């Protein structure tokens, strides 16, 4: 499709985001990012407010392929919204970006939005933030370690799980600390012990 495609054709691509077949959705948003990125991005951000779950989830997936272009607009959308569903969708879009582009440099504004999401009143937003930070990887390590040591058990379990495959020395030190602390929540402790065993097994295989 040529870059000069009409608005009508772009409207058709947005209609395709509501298609029940994920393949049709994927083809639509890949076409958007290739040929209509500037026109599509604002409309995709608006779709995060959509009541139709299929379209909203498709918008999250679509924003994931916009990578750097979507980072700052998503942060602005997150901070501006009073709707927990919209905020969760912004966070999930960050997870999609990080999953699609491993090692991508996340700007300070986006990291600040994810950190704010950790303290969101909505449990869905808060847990989604941990999962997104897990996708971000090493850049998010300090935040994830804070969450592991935090008082929110559900978030701590999610953070430990996100870091379970890491053999970074700071992660190992945190897990060892949690495994011996009397105040560690039983569910967190169980996850930590399992993760330490996984790291030990990984090191044995690599030896």
Question: Residue locations for each model-derived region?
Answer:
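Structural detector for internal amphipathic alpha-helices that build alpha-solenoid repeat scaffolds
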Residues: 1-6, 23-37, 46, 56-69, ...
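Residue-level signal for cytosolic alpha-helical hairpin/rod architecture
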Residues: 10-11, 25-26, 41, 71-72, ...
């Amino acid at each position: 499709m040529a870059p000069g495609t009409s608005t009508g054709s772009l409207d058709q691509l947005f209609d395709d985001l509501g298609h029940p077949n994920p393949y049709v959705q994927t083809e639509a948003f890949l076409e958007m990012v290739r040929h209509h990125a500037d026109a599509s991005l604002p409309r995709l951000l608006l779709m995060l407010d959509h009541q139709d779950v299929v379209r909203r989830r498709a918008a999250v997936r679509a924003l994931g392929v916009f990578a750097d272009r979507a980072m700052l607009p998503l942060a602005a959308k997150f901070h501006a919204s009073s709707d927990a569903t919209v905020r969760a969708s912004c966070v999930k879009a960050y997870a999609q970006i990080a999953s699609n582009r491993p090692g991508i440099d996340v700007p300070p504004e986006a990291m600040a939005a994810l950190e704010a999401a950790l303290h969101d009143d909505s449990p869905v937003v808060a847990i989604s933030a941990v999962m997104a930070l897990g996708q971000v990887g090493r850049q998010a390590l300090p935040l994830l370690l804070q969450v592991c040591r935090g008082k929110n058990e559900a978030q701590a379990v999610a953070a430990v799980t996100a870091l379970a495959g890491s053999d970074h020395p700071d992660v190992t030190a945190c897990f060892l600390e949690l495994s011996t602390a009397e105040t560690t929540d039983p569910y967190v402790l169980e996850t930590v012990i399992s993760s330490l065993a996984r790291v030990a097994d990984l090191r044995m295989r690599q030896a």
